[in-house]
Every structure is written in structure tokens, then in C-alpha cells.
Amino acid sequence: MLIPSKLSRPVRLDHTVVRERLLAKLSGANNFRLALVTSPAGYGKTTLVSQWAAGKNELGWFSLDEGDNQQERFASYLIAAIQQATGGHCTTSEAMAQKRQYASLTSLFAQLFIELAQWHRPLYLVIDDYHLITNPVIHDAMRFFLRHQPENFTLVVLSRNLPQLGIANLRVRDQLLEIGSQQLAFNHQEAKQFFDRRLSSPIEAAESSRMCDDVAGWATALQLIALSARQNNHSAHQSARRLAGINASHLSDYLVDEVLDNVDVSTRHFLLKSAILRSMNDALIVRVTGEENGQMRLEEIERQGLFLQRMDDTGEWFSYHPLFGSFLRQRCQWELTAELPGIHRSAAESWMEQGFPSEAIHHALAAGDAQMLRDILLNHAWRLFNHSELALLEESLKALPWESLLENPRLVLLQAWLMQSQHRYSEVNTLLARAEQEIKGVMDGTLHAEFNALRAQVAINDGNPEEAERLAKLALDELPLAWFYSRIVATSVHGEVLHCKGDLSQSLSLMQQTEQMARHHDVWHYALWSLIQQSEIQFAQGFLQAAWETQERAFQLIKEQHLEQLPMHEFLVRIRAQLLWAWARLDEAEASARSGIAVLSTFQPQQQLQCLTLLVQCSLARGDLDNARSQLNRLENLLGNGRYHCDWISNADKVRVIYWQLTGDKKSAANWLRHTPKPAFANNHFLQGQWRNIARAQILLGEFEPAEIVLEELNENARSLRLMSDLNRNLLLLNQLYWQSGRKTDAQRVLLDALQLANRTGFISHFVIEGEAMAQQLRQLIQLNTLPEMEQHRAQRILREINQHHRHKFAHFDEGFVERLLNHPDVPELIRTSPLTQREWQVLGLIYSGYSNEQIAGELAVAATTIKTHIRNLYQKLGVAHRQDAVQHAQQLLKMMGYGV
């Protein structure tokens, strides 16, 4: 819940001086990316900009305090301010900020700018007191903001110092409007106007000018002069002489003498007590100060000129001038030391009554009241956790004694979930074990089950599925149905374990249950996770169309709940890319993989390994080995600089081994094979994948017998576990083994099985990646004309993809090849005496590659009748009558030239 006053522009008071000369300068702010107003405290920055902002509807205002150094809080208020300025235009960004569903501030801002691209009118955002920001992550994000904000957007920053926003670069590019303390200082005319409005008796212009010079135009000093003159009935000039040369760092003594000591005791106590509030309203004042009418008292203090300012148009929220507020808080610590904890407790109670637990925690911490802090956390901590208020929660839990946590074990559970969210897995188990050992009395069974659900999640994340399954089952046996969050966690973990074990049907059922529970209770990240797992399971079962449809539901969930910037979004676009690759939709697969990299752009480069692997796969399927090598260099660098799940390593090794196969790099394959550990099992898709990598390397090295043993065992496991996509891949690799070892009948048998299974999986690229050896076999099957209709259609499609991407169309019949062929001693006499033209050689190459007449015409960009003429001529020159005879003749020529066909 956002505090309204932080989003309200300060009210323009009637007695303030209108700074016409500065307003004229600010009138051109829309021509700049950044308008920067800097000066020490008390020079009128906020007053000036609030005057300029008056009447501007499309302007948001964000007043900072120290708590805004938390990234999530900063983002929530900034987006809310822009929503006020645009009338709710940026709904997606708002939802992402409210639910903390973004990877980083920069990625949230990127989404914001996408929405603002449709906003065409001038737009302003004012950020006041930016000097309070000390978080370098926020500085980095705001530099990104300034670089990429729309041209019609102006950021206005008010700060006591020069902010770390790349000011020099903006200044050089003439994109910066600056107003500093020298310009903000009152001139003689403005000082005269000021005193005329504040003092009951007018003063001469010369005297006014002299006082202005004495304090160097410092607005706060002028205000103090007027206040002192009213309270003490002595001349304003006497006050001016006291303030001459003074600055903010030496102001405390003056404020004590001239302000605090000149108000009655009641007002003094009111000022000191209320100053602990960063912002205040009637209810807060009544509780903190004991005044019966807080609103009336606030308005009275405002009328007395005691540096209190309204924060919104309704007049409900107030705050002290930062300089005066800081002074009062310091004095409060000195003068009301004994009362201060009680004052903070009262403030916390009032904030709680108004529904602001984060502010209440701030005061409970300041009060040092562990019991109050504990009670707030027991009632509100999980909501704060779900809204990613992690830093505040961590600070709060550290402030509680361990005994208090033991007395309230759900707070121990909260602390453990905080550790889990930060990937501190070993600390989670240590904390829970210590708590179980030291909790007095018998531990509640439900709480123990919640501990086990969390432990199960930690175990699966840490690569320990056996322990994860044991703990998840224990949790589910003991958790009541009402404990939905822990039941969702445990059910999800159990489903994931069964997926790892190859029990796909039961795993799918549990993931569907997880989705239903998560949707019902609005636990959206687990709903998305369960959909991703369902899609992976369906892919493994060979039901790729069902996997596609599940992915569509996941994309819809991401859109509806604004989950675009969760890291899980990358997982979804990655498995979509895998599916598109399988179906030979390579351009779409590449685009999807690149979008996954974009989702992870703010994370460590190692997180991009899987998507980079897919980019290599796309290059390999296209036959673009140069590009594949370039991408592999980066991939291998990442492999050497990270610790990865076996699934990630298996996928990365797959593209490396395929690349070595396509380039004949036996040395690299042999070296990899020597150092690669062999998995103990092959009961899931990633273990099957790594064994397949081993078999492919063995085939490349001519180690056919051990490779065949591996593949036969993989097929047995795949059939028993219904890992149909893996079976399809295994059959294709077994086909290559048989083909290369000269067992052509066996090769044809398993290829027919693979084609039949592809009717279910839809695989195309898995065939294409095997290149010319696959093309030759498919040509033969097509020429036999015995394939069922679906297999025939798929074989023709695969052949077209191989011809398109691997450039086997007529590469063997180029001019250089033909010249060498004609000079070969064994060339048939018919070809030597009646040579083909270059175009006829090209046509022969395309016939050999399986092209129809229409496809040849399209490839060579000539009429179909012209192709028929070329075919008739080359048939006559070769002495053949049928297409199949021409293919066999071309194959004989290639063998004669030493090509392994």
C-alpha cells in the first residue's frame, strides 16, 4: 500500500514569492531530457518546482525518503507517479511493479517505455530529494531511464548534491537544463516581496537588500529572519546579522535559540514528537502527540510559519521542511530520550491502523520493541514476503532475538524462505535443523510439514531428487488442505521428482494438480512453473502438439498476470524454441531463443547457456558451420566458468558433438569422450541425451560396437518409460551407426521406424542435422515409392530442408568438379564424347538431390518446359530412360570421384 502523500505535489501557498525569472527558465523544460535543480537545503527547490508544476496535469510527483533505497519500493512509487501523470496509461508496468514481477529496474523501465511509446503528449516526472538515494543499483537504473526515455518525456530531479546520473554526458549533448544554488538564491527584488508578505510592517528596499546580501539570498535564512522578528518583536535586521555567513551545518544552535526557545512548551513538544514522522496526517498526530484535533494543530503550526508544508491538495498530509525536520529529530533524541520509544510505538500503532505495515515496522525497529515487531511480522510478514519486501523483512528478523523466533516458529520458516529466495540452500537446512532441535515442547505437526515442504524445494533445487521426494511426501501426508502454499510447493516438487525418474504420466497429473491449486490461490509463479513442466513432459512423451498448446496457455498466463520479467519466462520461450527447432521453423526458433537471452539480460551470462545452445542448434540445422563455431566459442567459455545442472551440460555437449561430426573433428570428440562421466541411469530425457552424445562421439570415432550397446539400452529404457521423443532421436542415431558400418538393411529398418514415429512427434530438424547420409537414404526410399503417404510426405519435406540448408543441391557438379570428372581415367566414354552442358550438370545434381521438375525450375528460375528440355537432353547423353536410372548414374559418378555415398 502506497502512502498518498509521497505521490502528491506540494501545495502552492498564497504567501510564497513567485520566482518569475526561474519559472521562465523552467518553461523550456520540455526541450530537455533532464531538468536538474540542485542546492543545499533551504534554497526553495521544492517550492520553485511546485510553482512551475501548477496547472500541469500530465505531471507525476515522487517525494523520496530514506526507505526508497529499496529497489522494489522505489519502482512502485515511480510507476505510480507516472500512472498519475498519464491517467493510468501504463497498466502492464503498474501491475508488474505492484506484484514485483520484473527481473530488474532496467527491465521494468524498458516495459514502461514500450507503453509510453503510445503516449504522444509532453510528460513530466518530478523526483524530489534525490540526494537520499544511496543505492548504486537505483543510480544505474536511472541512468538507463535517462538514456532511453521517450523524446516527449522530461525528468525533473531535485537534489542537494549532483546526482550520479551521467550529468556530464547530458550536458555535452545539450540535453540538460540546470538550476543551481546561485540561481535559486533570492535577489533583492524577490527578498523585498518576501518580507512584504511575511512582516506586518514594511521595510525599506535598501534594508531588505542588505539583509538579502547578509544571508546570500538563502531562502531559509530569510524565513528565519521573518519568524524571529515576529516572535521577538525586534528588528529583522538584527536577525539578519545573526544569520550572516551561517549555513545548514551550523544552523542547529540558531534554530534552538530563535525557534524552539520562542514557542510555548506545548508547541515545542508537539514539534519534537511529530518530527519522528516522515509524513503525517490527523490520525498519526492524535496518536503520537496526544492532541485531540491533529488536523487543527497541523494547520496552526503551518500558519505560524514553522516549516510545515502540505503534501497534497486535500490538505490531509503534511511534512516538515527536510532541514527543519532533521533538526527536530535530532533534538527529539536529546530532549525526549526516555519518551522516544513510546512515541515510536504510538506511531507504529497508528500506521498499522491505517494499513501501512512497512511504515509500522520502521517505527517498531526505532522503538527497539521486539514484541511489537514480532506481532507485526506474525500478522503481515507473509504478505510483505509475497510483495518482495525482502530487505525490510531480513532487517526485522535480525532485530528479533533467537528465543522470540523459537517461540514463534513460523517466523523461523519465514527466515528460511528468505534464505531460499536468495539461493542460500545450505543455510536453510542448518536453520531449520537448529530450530527443530531447540524449539521447546512438541513441535506442531503442521509446522513440521511446512518445514519439510521447504526442505523438499531446497533439495530439488540442489539436485537431490531422492531426498526431495521423501520430504515432499512427508509434507503432503501431514499438511491440512487449508495450508495451500506449502501443499502447492510439495506437490510441485513431487511432480518434478517423478519427471526426473521418468514416470511421466504421474508427473503430468501432479503438475496439473499444482496448476489448479496455484491458479485457485493466485500463486502465479507456481502456476507458470507447473505449465512449463507439463509442456516438457508432453514433449518427452512425443506429444509435441499438446506441448505447444500447453505453452500457449503459459504465454497467456504471463500476459494476464504480467510475468514477462520473471526468469521462468526465459524457460518458457526456450522450450518453445526447442519445439520450433524440432519442426524446422528455424527463424522462429532463433527469435524465441534470442528473446530468452533478452529476458536474462540483467542476470549473469551463465544463465544464458541454454538459449545460446539453441542458437548453435539453429546454425547447425542450417549448415552454417562458421556461425556455429563462433557461437560455440562463447558457449565453451561459459561452460568453463560456471556450475550447471546435468540437463544444461547435456544440451551444450549435444551441439558440440554434432559440430565435431559435421566437421570430422575426431580429436575433439575423443578428448571429450575420455573426460565425460557416464551417467548411472538413462531414465529421463536429459540422461538419455547425454548417453546419446556419448554414442554419437563413439560413432564418429568408429567405435560402432559400444555405441550400438548404448543405443539399444537407451531404446529399451525409452520404450518402457514411454520417452517417445528420445526414442525418435535414438532411432535416428542408430540409423547413422548402421549406415556408416555398412549395415544398409538395418539402417533402412530403423529409419522407417523413425519416420513412422515422427508422425507423432513432428520431428524434421532431427533428421536434417544428419546431413547427406540421411539425404541419400531418403532419396532411395522415395524412389522405391513404398512409403505410406504421411511418411512419404515427411521424407520429401526433410529432403527439401537438407537441400536448402546443407547446400547439397548441386555442389558436387560445379565447374571444378566437372573438370576433374572429365579428366578422370575411369569416366564413361559416353560422357567424354558427349559432354553435358554446365546447366545439365546442375539439373542432374538436383535430380540426384530428390527435386521434382517443378522444384528444379524454381531453383534455377527457369520455365518448367525448359527443364523438361534439359532433362531430355541429359537422359540422351547419359543413355538412361528414367529418373531412377539418372540418380543411380549420378551416384556411380560420385563414388568414382571418391565421395562416400
UniProtKB/Swiss-Prot annotation:
The Gene Ontology biological process terms listed for this entry are: positive regulation of carbohydrate metabolic process; positive regulation of DNA-templated transcription
Residue ranges the UniProt entry marks as DNA-binding: 853-872
Q: Which Pfam families match?
A: GerE, TPR_MalT
**How does its activity get regulated?**
Activated by ATP and maltotriose, which are both required for DNA binding.
- Tell me the GO molecular function terms: ATP binding; DNA binding; DNA-binding transcription factor activity
Keyword annotations for this protein, in alphabetical order, are: Activator, ATP-binding, Carbohydrate metabolism, DNA-binding, Nucleotide-binding, Transcription, Transcription regulation
Q: Which Gene3D superfamilies match?
A: P-loop containing nucleotide triphosphate hydrolases (3.40.50.300), Tetratricopeptide repeat domain (1.25.40.10), Winged helix-like DNA-binding domain superfamily/Winged helix DNA-binding domain (1.10.10.10)
What SUPFAM superfamilies does its record include?
A: C-terminal effector domain of the bipartite response regulators, P-loop containing nucleoside triphosphate hydrolases, TPR-like
Subunit arrangement?
Monomer in solution. Oligomerizes to an active state in the presence of the positive effectors ATP and maltotriose.
The entry's function note states: Positively regulates the transcription of the maltose regulon whose gene products are responsible for uptake and catabolism of malto-oligosaccharides. Specifically binds to the promoter region of its target genes, recognizing a short DNA motif called the MalT box.
* Similarity section: Belongs to the MalT family.
Task: Please report the name of this protein according to its UniProt entry.
Answer: HTH-type transcriptional regulator MalT
